Amino acid sequence: MRASKYHLNTLKEAPAEAEIASHQLMTRAGMIRKLAGGIYTYMPLGLKVIRKIEGIVREEMNAAGAIELLMPVVQPAELWMESGRWEQYGAELLRIKDRHQRDFVLQPTSEEVITDIARNEIQSYRQLPLNFYHIQTKFRDERRPRFGLMRGREFTMKDAYSFDRDEAGAQRSYDIMYAAYQRIFQRLSLEFRAVAADTGSIGGSRSHEFQVIADTGEDLIVYNPESDYAANIELAEAPALLAARAAPAQDLEAVPTPGAAKCEDVAKLLGLPLARTIKSIVLAVDQPEGPAQVWLLLLRGDHELNEIKAGKLPGLAGFRFATETEIVDHFGCKPGYLGPIKTARPVHVVADRTVANMADFVCGANREDYHYQGANWGRDLPEPELVADLRNVVEGDPSPDGKGALSIQRGIEVGHVFFLGTKYSEALKATFLDDNGKPAVLQMGCYGIGVTRIVGAAIEQNHDARGIIWPRAIAPYEVVICPVGWGKSETVRDTALALYEALRARGVDVMLDDRDSRPGVMFAEWELIGVPLRVTVGERGLNEGVVELQARREAEAAKVPVDQALAQTLAKLDLL
């Protein structure tokens, strides 16, 4: 491609709303243009990157035995009602009506549609296993779209769905797709981790996220540098304490703590470590009849509640945070001074493992501006009704596999694989005849990759102060040739054109910048766009018999003889 015949429109400044590097740089490089909140036009450079990602994904899906199809963006509500997700999915599911007032959705995912296809197309075990995939536009009505393509409302994903006759076969399909995902992200040249994850609204019994490592990631990844253990923060298990609880050494005392409504303030006021305090979190579970059931969850003052773990406890499915009215009714006190001792009304008490092991702790006294000091289980209050892992792990916690301490880093989720089992096939009655001629329910897996999110994630991991630094595999162009003096020197033009044609003939995706721009402007623009390798052809260099090769990741350019320019460019590309 020649720049004079292409659309390049870079910007000096990013829009004020662009908070992270990928959003800023994609906008400045002319890759995307905002149409509405969370909705973008992919400009030519941006679309080229997307198509290259899709190409790698498609190759690996095909190699793994998956078969491509294309399912519609608009889906009938009846399928979502049949699966039960019409009500479960929430406000992110964009619901629309046609002219006949029939309900439809703009698909955020395609489990219902693919299961409907399976129940109509698969009749016999002889047709199994099967794995279908598509690369399609999705829509999720995010409350607060932000970060450009990272959390948009309209985006592109690859979804694959496997169908097997039994659980063992479904596990094999899961493992095949897991391995395919490993290959995809390796080919994309991204630093990533596969981590055990919660199944969320998709459901199923097992899942892994593929997380691109980036400081701006919204997810926290927990891993053990000394082993293969890795999980996201939602699933990472905080270890049980092995040491016995210490015997009480203090008497229970109600102490004044005026204005100290947070554990940090209480600890500072009393001159105690934050880890000696207990925070009280009040949840409510609505009942079919009568008032909501109220629960008191207790965590150490320096720990944070893991809502996913809490929601999996018996009786806490579908919980919400209690209202102030419910809190006052059950504790006789407003939030800030709540505790498990002498509540106004009975509540269910769940203690985190660390809290259940504490002695002489500080907790709210259910009286404004007062806390108890020297509180002890069994003496001052009953043992907790339930002891469970309620908290997020922290850096340095012992690894659940017993092989060292945990580390935590941030990541961007770009892929997710799920072992669904029969969640959707049972709901939609997707069955087949087994080898005994009897009906059996299909075993399923589903596997997603965020194609457009990968674009942003790759930039977050590969950029500097000057712009994007694309991995070669997904760069919009692999090489840019920058002739200095294009309009003045026939030798420069002829040399640049000859190299351009030679690279094209060898299948290199190359751009020739024939716009006759000033060198500084031209170089800065291509550094912003992030092409991995720049070849500079100038009259001064040609007089010395050389051209310059400048890898985007490297500080220094290399001079190579003109007659070796093609070979050296190809050799340099192979190293990128």
From Swiss-Prot:
Homodimer. It catalyses: tRNA(Pro) + L-proline + ATP = L-prolyl-tRNA(Pro) + AMP + diphosphate. Pfam families: HGTP_anticodon, tRNA-synt_2b, tRNA_edit. Its main location: cytoplasm. PANTHER family: MITOCHONDRIAL RIBOSOME PROTEIN L39/PROLYL-TRNA LIGASE FAMILY MEMBER (PTHR42753), PROLINE--TRNA LIGASE (PTHR42753:SF2). Consists of three domains: the N-terminal catalytic domain, the editing domain and the C-terminal anticodon-binding domain. Catalyzes the attachment of proline to tRNA(Pro) in a two-step reaction: proline is first activated by ATP to form Pro-AMP and then transferred to the acceptor end of tRNA(Pro). As ProRS can inadvertently accommodate and process non-cognate amino acids such as alanine and cysteine, to avoid such errors it has two additional distinct editing activities against alanine. One activity is designated as 'pretransfer' editing and involves the tRNA(Pro)-independent hydrolysis of activated Ala-AMP. It is found in: Cytoplasm. Keywords: Aminoacyl-tRNA synthetase, ATP-binding, Cytoplasm, Ligase, Nucleotide-binding, Protein biosynthesis. GO terms for biological process: prolyl-tRNA aminoacylation. This is Proline--tRNA ligase. GO terms for molecular function: aminoacyl-tRNA deacylase activity; ATP binding; proline-tRNA ligase activity. Belongs to the class-II aminoacyl-tRNA synthetase family. ProS type 1 subfamily. It is an enzyme of class 6 (ligase). Its EC number is 6.1.1.15. One of its GO terms (cellular component) is cytosol. Coiled coil: none annotated.
